[in-house]
Regions:
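Alpha/beta-hydrolase superfamily serine-hydrolase fold, recognizing
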Residues: 1-165
């Protein structure tokens, strides 16, 4: 049975780290990773040039700074942050499993997710990115919202395509 990595938000740090660690240590070959509005770059917590419309709902830059500071035990944005803590810090993203990323257009993590998807694609990793306009961080929790139902449908279809061709 194919092994699939799936997690949302800050939990993605562990998911993306597991994919990197497995690749680096010749661990299990994951068939697919599904990253839901992933929190993968500590540098977002200290950026001053963020788009003014992102990060205003649910997960703010202040929350993000606290989260990264708590995880790292030091200032986010330092030069020596491990890619196993912040996957966007990986120098090499080749050899990672096919990846599906879903993120809202108002999510604080939008820009880091777009950049990570671009890096994966340039490294030859099959990647599918869905950006849901006007959706904020955590929108999957609004289970009856049309955008959430669409995102869940898109996820199921991507999983089917990645696993069954």
């Amino acid at each position: 049975m194919p092994q699939v990595l799936n997690y949302a938000s800050s939990g993605v740090r562990g998911t993306a780290a597991a994919a990197l660690y497995a690749r680096d240590r010749q661990g299990p070959k994951f068939a697919f990773q599904h990253l839901i509005y992933p929190m993968i770059d500590d540098r977002t917590a200290v950026r001053k040039d963020l788009h003014p419309c992102v990060g205003e709902f649910v997960w703010t830059q202040k929350n993000n700074y606290f989260g990264w500071r708590s995880l790292l035990g030091e200032e986010p944005g330092a030069a020596d942050v491990s890619p196993y803590a912040a996957a966007a810090r990986a120098a090499d993203v080749s050899g990672l499993p096919p990846t599906y990323i879903s993120v809202g257009g108002l999510d604080l993590f939008l820009e880091e997710n777009l950049a990570y998807a671009d890096r994966l694609s340039r490294a030859g990793v099959p990647v599918e990115l869905h950006m849901y306009p006007r959706a904020y961080h955590g929108f999957y929790r609004a289970t009856n919202a049309r955008v959430t139902r669409q995102a869940e449908h898109d996820t199921r279809e991507a999983l089917r395509r990645f696993l069954h061709g």
